[in-house]
């Protein structure tokens, strides 16, 4: 014989719920007395306080082993990468000569990017250094901070400096300037050579044919050793990265050209196919003419 439970009315359910929240007979709130609530809250307070203290202590111990100025591990940063300016989506530099808006955005980006390289700013913040040798600034037991940096003046970029340039870095005439920038690597030394240099080529035979002639600033795409080593953002406060400007003179119009630029030095390997971004950068260049 099945015994059916008596179905509670809505009022009974409400009364039971009210009694669960606050029972005036036992003075319990949500099934616990005030003392019980005090003990359980104290337990969780101590428990989570202990976890917080342990986390804080382990973080503090770890941070004592980390330098504010130099990364502890640099084995995966031995070879610097390259990047181009103007910075574009997918590294595609596309110029429509007759469409001002297509290249004006590049010009505005370059104006902002090159502003810190103005000769007046460089003379105010950085030193005139002796070329052909590293500008080393050892601590010798005493923290040598901040490190001084060598001047890289905008005028060194020649026809790509944008100073008094009616062609807007060549973008209005179909002879654009693309700037090659080497990423910063702390304590990087290029080797015993007097300088490094950037070289650019078409990736394939047809790209080489369509690329045409180009000139580089500084001459031969040289990057002097006096801009190295780099000591880090906090040490080298006013450090200015050296640049190489590539001015493309007669790119075949209306054709997409794949360009690859590399930095060459004794201590830089550019033939590692496992890392296609080591010491090189590839970008697409297209000059559209009506």
From Swiss-Prot:
The chain crosses the membrane at residues 40-67. GO terms for cellular component: apical plasma membrane; astrocyte end-foot; astrocyte projection; cell body membrane; cell periphery; cell projection membrane; cytoplasm; external side of plasma membrane. Highly expressed in brain (at protein level). One of its GO terms (biological process) is third ventricle development. Residues 193-290 are annotated as: immunoglobulin-like. Keywords: Cell adhesion, Cell membrane, Disulfide bond, Glycoprotein, Ion transport, Membrane, Potassium, Potassium transport, Signal-anchor, Sodium, Sodium transport, Sodium/potassium transport, Transmembrane, Transmembrane helix, Transport. Glycans are attached at residues 96, 118, 153, 159, 193, 197, 238. Disulfide bonds join 129-150, 160-177, 200-261. Pfam families: Na_K-ATPase. One of its GO terms (molecular function) is transporter activator activity. The keyword DNA repair does not apply. It is a single-pass type II membrane protein. Residues 68-290 are extracellular. Gene3D superfamilies: 1.20.5.170, Na, k-atpase alpha subunit. It is found in: Cell membrane. Residues 1-39 are cytoplasmic. Belongs to the X(+)/potassium ATPases subunit beta family. The C-terminal lobe folds into an immunoglobulin-like domain and mediates cell adhesion properties. This is the non-catalytic component of the active enzyme, which catalyzes the hydrolysis of ATP coupled with the exchange of Na(+) and K(+) ions across the plasma membrane. The exact function of the beta-2 subunit is not known. Mediates cell adhesion of neurons and astrocytes, and promotes neurite outgrowth. The sodium/potassium-transporting ATPase is composed of a catalytic alpha subunit, an auxiliary non-catalytic beta subunit and an additional regulatory subunit. Interacts with isoform 2 of BSG. This is Sodium/potassium-transporting ATPase subunit beta-2. It comes from Rattus norvegicus (Rat).
